[in-house]
Amino acid sequence: MLTARRLSLLLFALLWAGALQGQGIQQTKGSFQDKFRQLDEVLPTANVYRNAAGAPGHEYWQQEVDYNIEAVLDEDNQRLSATEIIRYQNNSPDTLTYLWFQLDQNRFRSDSMAEMSGTFNGSSPDADSNDPARISLGQLRALQYQSDANLGHQINAVSDSRENALAHTVVGTLMRVDLLEPLRPGDDVELRIDFEYNIVNGDVLSPRGGYEHFPEDERDGGNYIFALSQWFPRLVAYTDYEGWTNKEFLGSGEFTLEFGDYEVSMTVPADHIVSATGELQNPGDVLTREQRDRLEEAQSAARPVYIVTPDEALDNEREGSAQTATWRFAAENVRDFAWASSRKFIWDAKGHQQPGADQETVMAMSFYPKEGGTLWSDYSTEVVIHTLEVYSRFSFDYPYPTAQSVNVGFVGGMEYPMITFNGPRTELQEDGSRTYSLAEKRFLIGVVIHEIGHFYFPMIVNSDERQWTWMDEGLNSYLDSVAGREWDAEIPWGVEPRYITDYMESQNQVPVMTQSDSVLRLGPNAYSKPATAINILRETIMGRELFDFAFKEYSRLWAFKRPTPA
């Protein structure tokens, strides 16, 4: 028989044991994370479009969009007007009732989402919190310019091939065009869009494309360099993994586009020289006999040949012309089209030979004003060729007929198919000469390698830049460091682990998978961190032989296709 005291002790012991047992069960999960767990739980399920081996599936598809564009450049008013005829081929298994277009020039409107969602950063991080915020004169000028300049695409008409008007709705930097009939799998549709816009002043807003004014030139009113990019309404990509990739263009995130063929004509002042995606179709209409002979000579020359000499460019600068000329370009299987136009351009070229390749001769070319000087004539075209040699060795033969580097002062560096805009220039000295420092030389070499490298990633290996920035910037930063070290091993190319440790120790990092408009520090996160990781993978974990085989196989499999991270 239990006494009351013994019964109390027994009940206490049972309760205590139960409590201990409950605590033990709660603790079994712990905080352990298996760093070597299988990836099956995070990788997407393989399908007929993207197989489990990481290659395009047996039913892989992508859309095709062909453009025929006629554009007119109004230099005096810095305005562009154009008509584009678009053929959209629906290779998807889906029926489409509307199409989405990108109107990237609308990003510069004062009421754009980019401007309305931007935050004011008027003080340095080290400023006293009690100090009033400051706005720079440049920021104030930019705000006033956007308010006054009437920027953005003006869409004048949208119609089909039978000239039926099509309903269209503009939403920020996007436009939805409603089709009169559903576009079924395997069918195509033709549309026409008439548009115009005021070209952005690059010195004020530092955009990816716009105009640069040289008011000190002898010509009355000065001269201009026009760099035209994101200039025409472009089809939004329609993909197997996301459908319409219609994210708003906020500025940081770049572009997701479809491949197609382009025929583009640009009517410009008669003394302008035009550089563009593709190949010039009418040299007899726009170049002198001597310039055409030089261009032919350059194909097999041992060093770059002037197509337009510095003296000829200087004569163009001084005079100006009231006449116009139309340059016609064609490009096959490209995902975009950009061009540059100016009477200031010096033009040099040299043929790059690829024996046995489908494109055996590639014309490497540079276009630059006198402000580029000997820095550009000494290095730009040769660096273009060096980059093609190195990247082709690690991936595939360069498939296009031209590779161009254009000096645009307000663009640090930007790439499009077959053409890049690069910023470094010489410094004007008191005696009128132009010189450049070692740092400026290295900057030009580095930026040309990086931007020409983008011809491969993502202009050919067509990853989604806005969604997964690291897939083009990280891979390209890794490979540009390889090309850079082969050019000059003394230049610090920045992919060794020691260059990323400070960032890796910093606070508020986000995953490299973060969408580009949401990254806190785009440079370290999308460029340096993945480039360093790839470098470690090649040099330490896999070894060069195994890594180089895998990298080349990835490049080959996804050339002219759209890879995703998995």
Sequence positions of predicted segments:
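Bacterial N-terminal signal peptides
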Residues: S8-A19
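Hydrophobic helix-coil surface modules that form long, contiguous segments used
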Residues: Q230, L235-W244, L250-I449, Y478
